[in-house]
């Protein structure tokens, strides 16, 4: 489980580290948090030959930017619901009507569900950087309002970066801070946290393939609003 040239990783070591992070996620007792903080292990053909080409393993994490506790419009669906046991003389007719009303309500609920706008979210991805040979955190904002550009650094600072990180990231600029480039899988312009300063920070920790990405996320993720559930850290 050791890392040959720590903190640098080769492709095999990074792939194994991704599998360990995925297992921690699958085994953690996340409860309801699992519905909004989603992690999955991915394999894809890398289109950027600077990343080595061929198939690559990476980790994708998604979370909502705004979480509505009434997601699903339950308050609207339950407006006409009653627990009353009172029954009139025309019970069968009333029940038939109730059944028809329920079917119509179900259809209306489905229409509302289809029409409901998609939730704004952030999608993070962990890839092995081809030059620095350490994990690199990419991220993309999705389903933002039409008047809010997703590929805009001001939007990133407003939506993702906690106040305590803003001054430091702006001082670092494009080297050591938030940078933009073509995504290694899709080729679409995307943001990433520049990995050049990671080596000094993570070298202070005792890492192997089983815990490397958990420690790395603790060092890197917070500056763009990515926090690992504590249940995963306890695995």
Curated annotation (Swiss-Prot):
Pfam family, one: Autophagy_act_C
Entry coiled-coil feature ranges: none
EC number: 2.3.2.-
Inactivation phenotype: Significantly decreases the radial growth of colonies under nutrient-rich conditions.
Protein's membrane topology: Peripheral membrane protein
Top-rank taxon, per record: Eukaryota
InterPro entries: Atg3/Atg10 (IPR007135)
Protein transport is among the record's keywords: yes
EC class name: transferase
Molecular functions (GO terms): Atg12 conjugating enzyme activity
Localization of this protein: Preautophagosomal structure membrane
Assigned GO CC terms: cytosol; phagophore assembly site membrane
Keywords from the named record: Autophagy, Membrane, Protein transport, Transferase, Transport, Ubl conjugation pathway
Principal localisation: membrane
A GO BP annotation: autophagy of mitochondrion
Active site, UniProt feature: 196 (glycyl thioester intermediate)
Matches recorded under PANTHER family: UBIQUITIN-LIKE-CONJUGATING ENZYME ATG10 (PTHR14957:SF1)
Family (UniProt): Belongs to the ATG10 family.
Subunit field text: Forms homooligomers. Interacts with ATG7 and ATG12.
Function: E2-like enzyme required for the cytoplasm to vacuole transport (Cvt), autophagy and nucleophagy. Acts as an E2-like enzyme that catalyzes the conjugation of ATG12 to ATG5. ATG12 conjugation to ATG5 is required for proper localization of ATG8 to the preautophagosomal structure (PAS). Likely serves as an ATG5-recognition molecule. Autophagy is required for proper vegetative growth, asexual/sexual reproduction, and full virulence. Autophagy is particularly involved in the biosynthesis of deoxynivalenol (DON), an important virulence determinant.
Protein name per its UniProtKB record: Ubiquitin-like-conjugating enzyme ATG10
Organism: Gibberella zeae (strain ATCC MYA-4620 / CBS 123657 / FGSC 9075 / NRRL 31084 / PH-1)
């Amino acid at each position: 489980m050791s890392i040959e040239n720590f903190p640098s990783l080769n492709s095999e070591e990074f792939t194994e580290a991704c599998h360990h992070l995925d297992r921690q996620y699958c085994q953690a007792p996340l409860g309801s948090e699992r519905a909004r903080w989603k992690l999955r292990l991915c394999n894809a053909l890398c289109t950027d030959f600077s990343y080595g080409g061929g198939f690559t393993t990476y980790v994708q994490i998604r979370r909502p930017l705004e979480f509505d506790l009434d997601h699903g419009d339950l308050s609207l669906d339950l407006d006409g619901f009653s627990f009353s046991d009172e029954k009139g003389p025309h019970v069968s007719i009333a029940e038939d009507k109730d059944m028809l009303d329920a079917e119509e309500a179900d259809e209306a609920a489905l229409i509302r569900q289809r029409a409901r706008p998609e939730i704004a979210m952030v999608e993070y991805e962990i890839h092995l950087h081809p030059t620095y040979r350490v994990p690199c955190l990419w991220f993309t904002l999705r389903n933002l309002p039409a008047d809010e550009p997703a590929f805009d650094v001001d939007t990133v600072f407003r939506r993702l970066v906690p106040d305590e990180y803003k001054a430091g990231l702006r001082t670092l600029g494009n080297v050591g801070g938030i940078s933009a480039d073509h995504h290694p899988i899709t080729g679409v312009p995307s943001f990433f946290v520049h990995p050049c300063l990671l080596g000094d920070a993570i070298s202070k920790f005792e890492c192997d393939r089983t815990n490397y990405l958990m420690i790395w996320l603790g060092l890197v993720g917070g500056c763009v609003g990515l926090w690992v559930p504590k249940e995963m850290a306890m695995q």
